[in-house]
Amino acid sequence: MATTKSFLILIFMILATTSSTFAQLGEMVTVLSIDGGGIRGIIPATILEFLEGQLQEMDNNADARLADYFDVIGGTSTGGLLTAMISTPNENNRPFAAAKEIVPFYFEHGPQIFNPSGQILGPKYDGKYLMQVLQEKLGETRVHQALTEVVISSFDIKTNKPVIFTKSNLANSPELDAKMYDISYSTAAAPTYFPPHYFVTNTSNGDEYEFNLVDGAVATVADPALLSISVATRLAQKDPAFASIRSLNYKKMLLLSLGTGTTSEFDKTYTAKEAATWTAVHWMLVIQKMTDAASSYMTDYYLSTAFQALDSKNNYLRVQENALTGTTTEMDDASEANMELLVQVGENLLKKPVSEDNPETYEEALKRFAKLLSDRKKLRANKASY
C-alpha cells in the first residue's frame, strides 16, 4: 500500500510541474484502463461494445473505433489482450478488432485457451493455443505501430523487474519494440495458469535483449489505471498534443477504468478462526483473489479521492461489478454457460447506479463520457484543419 501511495504522490508531482501550451484549446488527455481477470475480460468487453456503439452513433460513423478517441489505452493480463486488439492496426491501418468483436472472440477461442493440458507438473494450461491465436490475429505488428499510445505491463522473472511496453519508451529503450503477440501473451501468462514467455528483441546496438516474462498483474496489480496515468503525464511533458495536463488540473484529464469484477463472498466465507488453521496450500488457493480484490479497491480509492479533491470527480469513472458469485468469480471457466453469465453481468452492470451516493447509472455515465470523447475529437480535428 505504501508503494502505491508513493507512486500516486510521484504522479501528482509530475502533474504539478507539467507545462502546457495546448490547454487553452480546451484539450483533454483521454485514458482508458482495462483490468486483468482471465475469461472475465468478457465484462469490460461488453462495456467497450456499448461505449464504441455510442461513439459511432454520436459521430454518425460506423467505422469509429475506440483508438480514435483515447490518447492512452492501458491494460494488464486479459486487459492487455483487449488493449492490443483495439489498438493494433490491420492492413488498412485501422484497429483489427471492433469492440463488438471482442466478446465473440472469447466465445470462439476461450474454451481452447482454457483447455487443461493434462500434465501433472507445470501450469494448468500449456499456452500453445493462446500463442497460436495471438500470432494469427496480431501478425508481425510491433509496439511502434500501435494506433495510439499503449501501456501493457509484464514482469521479468530473470531480472525481477516490471516491464512496461509503451510507444513513448521506445526512443530510450528500443528493445521494448516487441511484437504485439509476444507482449499480449506475456501480460496474460499468469503463474500457475500459463507458462512464462521467453523471447528476444534487439537493442540500439543490434545486440540481443532477452525477456523472461509473466503476467503483468505481478508487476502492477490487476488494475493498471495508475500506471496508465503515469504514462499520460510523461507524454504531456514531451508532446504538445498531450500537454493539457497542468498544475494538477484533472479537469483536463478523462479517465475510464474498467474492471473485470470482484466478489463479495470473502467476508461471508472466511473467518480468522477458520484461517488460523490453514496450511500454505489453503492460502495459495485464495490469496490471489483476495490480493487482486484489495489492490483493485485501493487503486480506485486513491484515484477517486484525488479526482474529487481536485474538483474533477466527473472526469473519472470506474466501472466495476463488486458482487460476482459462483462460477463468474473464476478466471478460467470458459464454459459457454459461464461466458453467457459474464455477458449478463456486463449488460446488467450498465443499468446499475455508479455508487450509493450517485444515482447516475453506468449507462448514463458512459453516454456522458462518450459525449466528452466525441467533442474532444472534433475539437482536435477542427484545430488540425486550420
Curated annotation (Swiss-Prot):
Record-given protein name: Patatin-17
Coiled-coil stretches: 321-384
Organism expressing this protein natively: Solanum cardiophyllum
Enzyme class: hydrolase
UniProt xrefs under InterPro entries: Acyl_Trfase/lysoPLipase, PNPLA_dom
A single MF term (Gene Ontology): phospholipase activity
Origin organism lineage: Eukaryota, Viridiplantae, Streptophyta, Embryophyta, Tracheophyta
Reported impact of S77 to A/D/T/N/C: Loss of esterase activity and impaired insecticidal activity
Chain positions of motif GXSXG: 75-79
SUPFAM superfamilies named among the record's database cross-references: FabD/lysophospholipase-like
Keyword field: Coiled coil, Glycoprotein, Hydrolase, Lipid degradation, Lipid metabolism, Plant defense, Signal, Storage protein, Vacuole
Annotated signal peptide: 1-23
Annotated function: Non-specific lipolytic acyl hydrolase (LAH), an activity which is thought to be involved in the response of tubers to pathogens. Catalyzes the non-specific hydrolysis of phospholipids, glycolipids, sulfolipids, and mono- and diacylglycerols includng p-nitrophenyl caprate. Confers resistance to southern corn rootworm (SCRW).
Gene3D superfamilies according to UniProt: Cytosolic phospholipase A2 catalytic domain (3.40.1090.10)
Positions occupied by motif GXGXXG: 36-41
A GO CC annotation given for this chain: vacuole
